[in-house]
Amino acid sequence: MMTQAQTYFYDGSDVALLNGQYTDVFSLLGMHSINEGKALVVRCFLRNAQKVDVISLKDGRKVASLERVNEAGLFAGTLGRRVKPFLYALRVVYPLCELDIIDPYQFGSLLDSQDLYLFGEGSSEQAYRFLGANWRQVDSVEGVHFCVWAPNAKRVSVVGDFNHWDDTRHVMRQHMANGLWEIFLPDVAEGTHYKFDLVYQNGERHAKSDPMATQMECAPHNASIVPKKHQHPWADTQWMHKRATTAWHRAAMSIYEVQLGSWRRKGEFGEQYFDYQDLIEQLIPYVKEQGFTHIELMPVSEYPFDGSWGYQPVGLYAPTHRFGDANGLKAFIDACHQAEIGVLLDWVAAHFPKDPHGLVRFDGTCLYEHEDPRKGTHPDWDTLIYNYDRGEVRSFLLSNACYWLREFHLDGLRLDAVSSMLYLDYSREPGQWLPNAYGGRENLEAIHFLQMLNQRLYQAFPGICMIAEESTAFAGVTKPTDSGGLGFGFKWNMGWMNDSLSYLGRDPIYRQYHHNQLTFSLMYAYSEQFMLSISHDEVVHGKGSLLHKIPGDDWQKFATLKAYYGFMWGHPGKKLLFMGSEFAQRDEWNHNHSLDWHLLAFEPHQGVQRWLRDLNQLYRQFPALSVLDYESQGFRWLDCDNGRDSIFSFVRYGEGSDVPLVFVVNMTPTLHQGFRIGLPQGGDFCEYLNSDSHLYGGSNQGNAGKVIAEDLPWQGMASSALITVPPLGCLILGPATDAPRDTSL
């Protein structure tokens, strides 16, 4: 015979609930009207509870005691003559304690229909505001709203410290139309660990990290963490206003690429990472002193495998625990901005790893990735490729980009491995890939996503920089989207990098036969808005450091590297240099160790560091070195054909009254005296920089800081001069004038 309490459950619903098979729990648990609205019933499921009372949150008074339905923890009861729903808590007596628990099943859905539409359409820019774990206040009750996308799951629960990881305690509300699951939990503290427990259609259970978590545990653990309520108070208003009106393609951009875990370390044996406060105190002043305009951070999204350097992230929204929390990262970026240093972030949207707690087969199906491995797996890295054709996946990625730019005030994103996104046959043999709808090899869905991403980000965040690492000849990477381009602001010049490093590694006696390796880039320099990048990829995996690539004795190595940097800073295009290269690190980069800062005790390394600092200062002072980077009138060869001497000479021009600068770069150890060079005007010329100066550890061959032009036409110029060209050196000359303005932000 059924008890009165048992009649409050539908036929078999109590059994299904206990077995974890009743998915529509909100229709059963919580407060509901019965008897055609003439009474209220409260049902709850609390394992190990001995007694449960209903308490009014308004006045704290007891309203009713619930009856035990069974020993498993089901309780139910009517609330006397009350017929209007009210906010309540459950006073639960356990064997060892008594707790007041605000029942989460009394709250309705907190999802907005417009948010749901945009998320499904693929155009949501703020999906992190309703997905994941977000602090909310509902009817004066504060708590955390949990929400996850898992359309093919049979059941989803949120489990964590707050419910002893019991998957039956907080089963979530399912939205059949869009595949979202949600629940609002008042009794959750910041810093609480949690996961989503999913039951697949085949009955398997899997605990997954929150794809939208903004904080995660240290590896090898992988729980998500409820974020802090307090957010960093920003103080970078002046920077943000100036950034919004800056045309970066005309400004000086000298970027210092940093891997935070190995720039510098602390501890007796260098075993401890710097935290963000350490980086504020040491990295920012260093970058400022060296004259770089920006820091580019290698990925800081949470990643379990140190050896991936962050390029295989599992927590795309969670700053890695290694250096501090989200507020610490925000404080670092804020401090950079106050020091007038921009911050860019490497962002990985091309693929994701197969870690079982991550996105892989998230709800038992290929949700974020393609089902067919010919489109869904990356053969080079054994990772998975996002399904850009799915609206929810596009929203996940678009919202993530917006999250970093909006919440962290980042000044731009550098997209990793764009080439692998653009081509369906990337690193695949015939028969291992599927053509697009037109039979071609282009990944049309990825192309559409990149166009949409760049268009929306540039509209939403004025003054940002979107940068593509793209190594093929794909046309229009930096062309506007309305002209059919991808819409990036800049593209890494991988061709220049490969050619110039190949040239750098040749013995000087043979460089004359490969002269075009340094001149060829000017044949296509204006086809895209290129950025000259010497990144981390060029100093790892047995490639050696830049210094190690160069033949000859130590003097030749250091002299050649300085001359190479001079050529790079004079070449059209923005600049990027990986950390350690600015002082000629001898060993290739090792992510497990700090840079070899002890090398700065030696004069040759000090000389390279001073040279880079002075190059950056000159670069920022003279508009001719940046304002016409992407217009052909900003550059003119004086002599690009002197392969016999391996000497390169050219002029950089600005606009109007901007001072032109003449570069002469000698890539052999031969001293040239009485070497005639054309000059853009008459009068006195200043030898602004000479890489062979004793200030930089050179042999001090040069022109004593001054050159006088003669009225003798040469190399297409009306004037010329006889100069001394130092061995393996770079000269930068310009008309004697007052110091021009700083062209950086």
Curated annotation (Swiss-Prot):
Name of the coding gene: glgB
Upper lineage: Bacteria, Pseudomonadati, Pseudomonadota, Gammaproteobacteria, Alteromonadales
Transmembrane feature ranges: none
Entry's Gene Ontology molecular function annotations: 1,4-alpha-glucan branching enzyme activity; cation binding; hydrolase activity, hydrolyzing O-glycosyl compounds
Active site: D416 (nucleophile), E469 (proton donor)
Annotated SUPFAM superfamilies: (Trans)glycosidases (SSF51445), E set domains (SSF81296), Glycosyl hydrolase domain (SSF51011)
InterPro entries: A-amylase/branching_C (IPR006048), Branching_enzy (IPR037439), GlgB (IPR006407), GlgB_N (IPR054169), GlgB_N_E_set_prok (IPR044143), Glyco_hydro_13_cat_dom (IPR006047), Glyco_hydro_13_N (IPR004193), Glyco_hydro_b (IPR013780)
Function: Catalyzes the formation of the alpha-1,6-glucosidic linkages in glycogen by scission of a 1,4-alpha-linked oligosaccharide from growing alpha-1,4-glucan chains and the subsequent attachment of the oligosaccharide to the alpha-1,6 position.
Alphabetical keyword list: Carbohydrate metabolism, Glycogen biosynthesis, Glycogen metabolism, Glycosyltransferase, Transferase
Official protein name in the record: 1,4-alpha-glucan branching enzyme GlgB
PANTHER family referenced in this protein's UniProt entry, alphabetically: 1,4-ALPHA-GLUCAN-BRANCHING ENZYME
EC number: 2.4.1.18
